[in-house]
Amino acid sequence: LVYNVVEISPDGLMHLLLIALGTLILSIASAIFFTHRKTRQRNQSLFNQQSKELLVSLLIPLITGGLLCLVLLFKGFVGILPPLTLIFYGLALVNGSKHTLPEIRNLGLIEICIGLFAVQFIEYGLVLWAFGFGVMQIVYGLIVQKKYPQ
Protein backbone atom coordinates (compact mmCIF):
# COMPACT_ATOMS: atom_id res chain seq x y z
CA LEU A 1 0.00 0.00 0.00
CA VAL A 2 1.20 3.52 -0.70
CA TYR A 3 0.83 4.54 2.95
CA ASN A 4 3.80 2.33 3.79
CA VAL A 5 7.24 3.77 4.28
CA VAL A 6 9.34 3.75 1.13
CA GLU A 7 13.10 3.44 1.33
CA ILE A 8 14.66 6.22 -0.72
CA SER A 9 18.34 6.09 -1.58
CA PRO A 10 20.40 9.19 -0.75
CA ASP A 11 20.78 9.84 -4.50
CA GLY A 12 17.03 9.50 -5.05
CA LEU A 13 16.33 11.82 -2.14
CA MET A 14 18.80 14.36 -3.52
CA HIS A 15 17.11 14.22 -6.94
CA LEU A 16 13.69 14.78 -5.38
CA LEU A 17 14.98 17.71 -3.33
CA LEU A 18 16.70 19.28 -6.35
CA ILE A 19 13.52 19.00 -8.42
CA ALA A 20 11.48 20.52 -5.59
CA LEU A 21 14.01 23.32 -5.07
CA GLY A 22 14.17 24.07 -8.80
CA THR A 23 10.39 24.20 -9.01
CA LEU A 24 10.23 26.48 -5.99
CA ILE A 25 12.84 28.86 -7.40
CA LEU A 26 11.14 29.01 -10.82
CA SER A 27 7.74 29.60 -9.20
CA ILE A 28 8.98 32.42 -6.99
CA ALA A 29 10.99 34.02 -9.81
CA SER A 30 8.07 33.98 -12.23
CA ALA A 31 5.66 35.30 -9.58
CA ILE A 32 8.00 38.20 -8.82
CA PHE A 33 8.63 38.88 -12.53
CA PHE A 34 4.96 38.98 -13.54
CA THR A 35 3.88 40.90 -10.44
CA HIS A 36 6.66 43.45 -10.96
CA ARG A 37 5.70 43.86 -14.61
CA LYS A 38 2.03 44.38 -13.71
CA THR A 39 2.75 46.88 -10.93
CA ARG A 40 5.15 48.82 -13.17
CA GLN A 41 2.42 49.09 -15.85
CA ARG A 42 0.09 50.55 -13.22
CA ASN A 43 2.77 52.84 -11.70
CA GLN A 44 2.42 51.11 -8.34
CA SER A 45 4.95 49.88 -5.83
CA LEU A 46 5.70 46.16 -5.75
CA PHE A 47 6.00 46.09 -1.96
CA ASN A 48 3.10 48.10 -0.58
CA GLN A 49 1.24 47.26 2.62
CA GLN A 50 -1.31 45.04 0.88
CA SER A 51 1.34 42.97 -0.89
CA LYS A 52 3.27 42.50 2.36
CA GLU A 53 0.11 41.30 4.13
CA LEU A 54 -0.67 38.98 1.22
CA LEU A 55 2.84 37.56 1.32
CA VAL A 56 2.67 36.84 5.06
CA SER A 57 -0.80 35.29 4.69
CA LEU A 58 0.42 33.00 1.92
CA LEU A 59 3.75 32.06 3.46
CA ILE A 60 2.51 30.83 6.84
CA PRO A 61 0.58 27.80 5.45
CA LEU A 62 3.07 27.26 2.59
CA ILE A 63 6.13 27.11 4.85
CA THR A 64 4.28 24.97 7.40
CA GLY A 65 3.19 22.53 4.69
CA GLY A 66 6.62 22.54 3.07
CA LEU A 67 8.36 21.69 6.33
CA LEU A 68 5.85 18.93 7.10
CA CYS A 69 6.35 17.49 3.61
CA LEU A 70 10.13 17.55 4.05
CA VAL A 71 9.86 15.65 7.33
CA LEU A 72 7.55 13.07 5.74
CA LEU A 73 9.83 12.78 2.70
CA PHE A 74 12.86 12.07 4.89
CA LYS A 75 10.83 9.47 6.79
CA GLY A 76 9.82 7.79 3.51
CA PHE A 77 6.12 8.69 3.41
CA VAL A 78 6.16 9.69 -0.25
CA GLY A 79 2.58 8.78 -1.19
CA ILE A 80 1.02 11.34 1.11
CA LEU A 81 3.06 14.26 -0.28
CA PRO A 82 0.91 15.14 -3.34
CA PRO A 83 -2.31 15.39 -1.29
CA LEU A 84 -0.61 17.41 1.44
CA THR A 85 0.86 19.90 -1.02
CA LEU A 86 -2.62 20.44 -2.48
CA ILE A 87 -4.14 20.91 0.98
CA PHE A 88 -1.53 23.38 2.24
CA TYR A 89 -1.54 25.30 -1.05
CA GLY A 90 -5.32 25.55 -0.77
CA LEU A 91 -5.02 26.76 2.82
CA ALA A 92 -2.52 29.40 1.69
CA LEU A 93 -4.89 30.61 -1.03
CA VAL A 94 -7.84 30.80 1.36
CA ASN A 95 -5.69 32.60 3.93
CA GLY A 96 -4.37 35.08 1.35
CA SER A 97 -7.69 35.62 -0.41
CA LYS A 98 -8.69 38.50 1.84
CA HIS A 99 -5.88 40.55 0.23
CA THR A 100 -6.61 39.76 -3.43
CA LEU A 101 -9.35 38.68 -5.84
CA PRO A 102 -12.37 36.90 -4.31
CA GLU A 103 -11.96 34.01 -6.77
CA ILE A 104 -8.72 33.05 -5.02
CA ARG A 105 -10.74 31.80 -2.04
CA ASN A 106 -12.80 29.50 -4.26
CA LEU A 107 -9.68 28.13 -5.94
CA GLY A 108 -8.21 27.49 -2.49
CA LEU A 109 -11.29 25.60 -1.35
CA ILE A 110 -11.22 23.52 -4.53
CA GLU A 111 -7.52 22.71 -3.99
CA ILE A 112 -8.27 21.64 -0.40
CA CYS A 113 -11.11 19.39 -1.56
CA ILE A 114 -8.96 17.80 -4.27
CA GLY A 115 -6.22 17.23 -1.66
CA LEU A 116 -8.63 15.59 0.77
CA PHE A 117 -10.00 13.42 -2.03
CA ALA A 118 -6.41 12.48 -2.92
CA VAL A 119 -5.76 11.40 0.69
CA GLN A 120 -8.71 9.02 0.43
CA PHE A 121 -7.60 7.70 -2.98
CA ILE A 122 -3.86 7.80 -2.41
CA GLU A 123 -3.06 5.66 -5.45
CA TYR A 124 -4.37 8.51 -7.64
CA GLY A 125 -2.54 11.19 -5.66
CA LEU A 126 -0.16 12.19 -8.43
CA VAL A 127 -2.94 12.36 -11.04
CA LEU A 128 -5.05 14.48 -8.69
CA TRP A 129 -2.00 16.62 -7.92
CA ALA A 130 -1.55 17.29 -11.65
CA PHE A 131 -5.27 18.08 -11.94
CA GLY A 132 -5.17 20.48 -8.98
CA PHE A 133 -1.97 22.29 -9.86
CA GLY A 134 -2.37 22.06 -13.63
CA VAL A 135 -5.94 21.98 -14.86
CA MET A 136 -7.45 24.00 -12.01
CA GLN A 137 -4.82 26.74 -12.36
CA ILE A 138 -5.52 27.03 -16.09
CA VAL A 139 -9.29 27.10 -15.54
CA TYR A 140 -8.88 29.71 -12.80
CA GLY A 141 -6.64 31.81 -15.03
CA LEU A 142 -9.18 31.73 -17.86
CA ILE A 143 -12.01 32.71 -15.51
CA VAL A 144 -10.06 35.62 -14.04
CA GLN A 145 -8.88 36.78 -17.46
CA LYS A 146 -12.47 36.79 -18.74
CA LYS A 147 -13.91 38.44 -15.62
CA TYR A 148 -11.18 41.09 -15.27
CA PRO A 149 -10.13 42.08 -18.80
CA GLN A 150 -7.08 44.26 -19.00
Per-range role (PLM):
Residues 1-66, 70:
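Selected alpha-helical membrane-embedding segments in polytopic membrane proteins
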